[in-house]
């Protein structure tokens, strides 16, 4: 690793530079960037300031590249930001977010709001790193997949920052809960059975529409995947298609359980970003 200065207008960002795999070129990494807007930082708690940070990895020597904003899993109660193994020509923004607290100090809305702020930061700043703001994708695993859908499907979220869901190039949730997340429910005092599906304003299924960015929902395969997870995601995609969405894919990774859905699903995220996802996986496509 070595220090690298990248001049962006009047600013100089000091990045950590590493060499990627052969033929892939070099990437520059900058870590722990605060992503909350200045007005939010004024009233932010110490915990929020600690968690609301992101890492950026970009290809060196090229411009106009696509970017994936990646949200980690962990049931909204654990986990930490990390990069995924995709083509080095695709930039990544790996973001932390606040985790649910039993005392109610952090709610499901707070988790989603943090994720939204990270995506809005990326839309506003990726051009400074050489990326194309029209090629910003959002993806995440499990709880991160849930956040991906909530940020990219509920128009009120990005609307707070002057953006629309269609300002995103695409959504690629991996094994995200399409109904209301079970821990969002539990931490709010809901004692109903975990697998009783609930659809309200905190459920991605409530926002199915034709007016969404391209979306691929990636899951493991029943019966190995988390109960109901693949089925509810297929319903989400099928509902979007029935409402007129023309670029919606559903992928069930053969024999993959919930954990293996990550390693099996990331290659599909890469294909999606590169525009190489097989049309045969698109629901509603003619066979």
Give, region by region, the residue ranges found by the protein language model.
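Short substrate-entry loop that stabilizes the transition state in hydrolases
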Residues: 63-65, 71-104, 226
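C-terminal catalytic histidine-bearing segment of alpha/beta-hydrolase fold enzymes
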Residues: 218, 234, 241-287
């Amino acid at each position: 690793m070595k220090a690298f200065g990248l001049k962006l207008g009047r600013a100089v960002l000091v990045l950590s530079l590493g060499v990627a795999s052969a033929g892939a070129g070099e990437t520059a990494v900058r870590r722990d960037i605060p992503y909350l807007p200045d007005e939010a930082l004024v009233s932010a708690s110490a915990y929020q300031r600690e968690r609301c940070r992101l890492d950026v990895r970009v290809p060196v020597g090229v411009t106009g590249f696509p970017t994936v904003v990646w949200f980690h899993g962990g049931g909204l109660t654990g986990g930490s930001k990390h990069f995924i193994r995709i083509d080095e020509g695709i930039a990544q923004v790996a973001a932390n977010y606040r985790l649910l607290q039993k005392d109610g100090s952090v709610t499901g809305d707070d988790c989603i709001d943090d994720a939204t702020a990270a995506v809005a930061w990326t839309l506003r700043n990726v051009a400074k790193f050489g990326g194309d703001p029209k090629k910003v994708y959002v993806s995440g695993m499990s709880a991160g997949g849930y956040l991906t859908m909530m940020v990219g499907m509920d128009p009120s979220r990005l609307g707070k920052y002057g953006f629309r869901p269609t300002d995103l190039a695409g959504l690629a949730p991996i094994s995200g809960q399409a109904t209301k997340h079970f821990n969002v429910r539990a931490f709010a005092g809901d004692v109903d059975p975990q697998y009783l599906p609930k659809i309200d304003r905190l459920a991605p299924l409530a926002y199915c529409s034709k007016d969404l960015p391209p979306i691929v929902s990636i899951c493991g395969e029943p019966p190995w995947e988390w109960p109901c997870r693949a089925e509810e995601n297929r319903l989400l995609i099928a509902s979007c298609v029935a409402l007129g969405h023309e670029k919606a894919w559903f992928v069930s990774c053969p024999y993959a359980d919930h954990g293996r859905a990550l390693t099996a699903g990331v290659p599909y995220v890469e294909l999606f970003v590169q525009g190489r996802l097989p049309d045969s996986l698109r629901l509603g496509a003619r066979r």
